[in-house]
Amino acid sequence: MGYDINXXLAQMXKGGVIMXXXXXXQAVI
């Protein structure tokens, strides 16, 4: 179970940054 959470957290952080940049525009960066 710990592995699943770690993998999800790692993907969320990477995917979250890309999604936020596209959804919020370049203002985030």
UniProtKB/Swiss-Prot annotation:
Q: Tell me the keywords, alphabetical order.
A: Lyase, Pyridoxal phosphate, Schiff base
For the protein in the UniProt heading, the enzyme class is lyase
Q: Does this entry carry the keyword Lyase?
A: yes
Name the chemical reaction catalysed here.
Answer: aldehydo-D-ribose 5-phosphate + D-glyceraldehyde 3-phosphate + L-glutamine = pyridoxal 5'-phosphate + L-glutamate + phosphate + 3 H2O + H(+)
Under Enzyme Commission nomenclature, its number is: 4.3.3.6
Q: Which domain of life is it from?
A: Bacteria
| Protein's pathway | Cofactor biosynthesis; pyridoxal 5'-phosphate biosynthesis
Q: Name one GO biological process term.
A: pyridoxal phosphate biosynthetic process
Listed GO MF terms? pyridoxal 5'-phosphate synthase (glutamine hydrolysing) activity
Q: Does the keyword Transmembrane helix apply?
A: no
The family note in this entry says:
Belongs to the PdxS/SNZ family.
Q: How does it assemble?
A: In the presence of PdxT, forms a dodecamer of heterodimers.
> Any further remarks?
On the 2D-gel the determined pI of this unknown protein is 5.1, its MW is 32.7 kDa.
Q: What is this protein called?
A: Pyridoxal 5'-phosphate synthase subunit PdxS
Tell me which species this is from: Clostridium pasteurianum
Its taxonomic path starts at: Bacteria, Bacillati, Bacillota, Clostridia, Eubacteriales
